[in-house]
Amino acid sequence: MASKTYQAGVKEYRQTYWQPDYVPLDTDILACFKITPQAGVDREEAAAAVAAESSTGTWTTVWTDLLTDMDYYKGRAYRIEDVPGDDACFYAFIAYPIDLFEEGSVVNVFTSLVGNVFGFKAIRALRLEDVRFPIAYVKTCGGPPSGIQVERDKMNKYGRPLLGCTIKPKLGLSAKNYGRAVYECLRGSLDFTKDDENINSQPFMRWRDRFEFVQEATLKAEAETGERKGHYLNVTAPTPEEMYKRAEFAKEIGAPIIMHDYLAGGLCANAGLANWCRNNGMLLHVHRAMHAVLDRNPHHGIHFRVLTKILRLSGGDHLHTGTVVGKLEGDRASTLGWIDLLRESFVPEDRSRGIFFDQDWGSMPGAFAVASGGIHVWHMPALVAIFGDDSVLQFGGGTLGHPWGNAAGAHANRVALEACVQARNEGRQIEKEGREILTAAAQHSPELKIAMETWKEIKFEFDTVDKLDIAHK
């Protein structure tokens, strides 16, 4: 460094940050951005600008560059690829040295990778498509507080997806009536019920009252059914201090699981709550409220597969992932990709599912994928086929909308689930034979028969906005 001299002025980013001959290190954090440059900005300069602005660069040369080893700390744009079917944008692959980031801090990673660079004038639109976290960084993060196997052991539930229900209406119920709805659903054979993400501590139902009535309902349902039950008590709060106060009370009354809105509540709060859950033996259900603001635009924002990885690192035992078949956004190939990123120990690069890098999670536990949003009994065969056993199938209106009430809706879901699991275990093609499987099960379950009649015409056949780029070919 002593031989370097300072030359004031502005130089092209590509002179420093575009290195097509660079071979990424095993310890580098790798990112794939989809870049739409402004007119007149060529690809190499745009990619280098993103590398610079998301790492060590600024708009002009500064003399303090000479006080450190810029060649070591800088981000490097090392590859550019075409986006299938879209000539206006391109993929840029950027490598960042691991020492740019605080250990175990996904907050710090996001501050750089999706920070000010997203407002850079030379870039018309920018999207973070994927990130490869090296195992050296993964091991500094806490990850899920319990993980899939520990949760199964705690809840004594094996060999099938778990069944849940979000209590509706999402807002307006009193605590006592809310607890009644929880009891009916759990008594009807569900494993879990859930606070809607909108429920915190509003005037119509304060959090402490809700917690008490819900836990009473849970214990009563457990006593009557002989099964372990739980309700996701949402501890998301205006401040971290209040969040921990609510979490402590949930533990005090014997609740097995709490809930947090990890994007609306903040990644820092989520990581802290995950650590608290790990230390206190609590399960943590995570909702993704606000995600579509970040991930739905196919040209600007953060892809949900990145948000999935960030959640697994930050900590959560469940994460909502979409359904493929329900009312919320998410195509099948992409959804299967981020489900694997949530649950598996190693996920190889697979462009057909939108996965740009190998991802090694080492010994970090996986988390349950939660399917929720506009699902009902007719979706059960597809849900079991798509999500497999390590999932939570979270119905709302598909339970509470049953003409005979909540318990009947819950019972219909449980019968449909067990029929599909049994058929799958017998080697049947449950997606193709779903109608026959459900019809046969309904012969012994009037609750299922009525549910099938009620929702036989309900479909959500809208095209996906955020498709895999390969689908545009």
Curated annotation (Swiss-Prot):
Substrate binds at residues 116, 166, 170, 288, 320, 372. It comes from the Bacteria. Mg(2+) binds at residues 194, 196-197. GO terms for biological process: reductive pentose-phosphate cycle. The active site is at residues 168, 287. Binds 1 Mg(2+) ion per subunit. Keywords: Calvin cycle, Carbon dioxide fixation, Lyase, Magnesium, Metal-binding, Monooxygenase, Oxidoreductase. The record marks 327 as: Transition state stabilizer. It catalyses: 2 (2R)-3-phosphoglycerate + 2 H(+) = D-ribulose 1,5-bisphosphate + CO2 + H2O; D-ribulose 1,5-bisphosphate + O2 = 2-phosphoglycolate + (2R)-3-phosphoglycerate + 2 H(+). Signal peptide: none annotated. It is an enzyme of class 4 (lyase). GO terms for molecular function: magnesium ion binding; monooxygenase activity; ribulose-bisphosphate carboxylase activity. The modification N6-carboxylysine is found at residue 194. Its cofactor is Mg(2+). Its EC number is 4.1.1.39. RuBisCO catalyzes two reactions: the carboxylation of D-ribulose 1,5-bisphosphate, the primary event in carbon dioxide fixation, as well as the oxidative fragmentation of the pentose substrate. Both reactions occur simultaneously and in competition at the same active site. HAMAP family: RuBisCO_L_type1. Belongs to the RuBisCO large chain family. Type I subfamily. The basic functional RuBisCO is composed of a large chain homodimer in a 'head-to-tail' conformation. In form I RuBisCO this homodimer is arranged in a barrel-like tetramer with the small subunits forming a tetrameric 'cap' on each end of the 'barrel'. Heterohexadecamer of 8 large chains and 8 small chains. This is Ribulose bisphosphate carboxylase large chain. It comes from Nitrosomonas sp. (strain ENI-11).
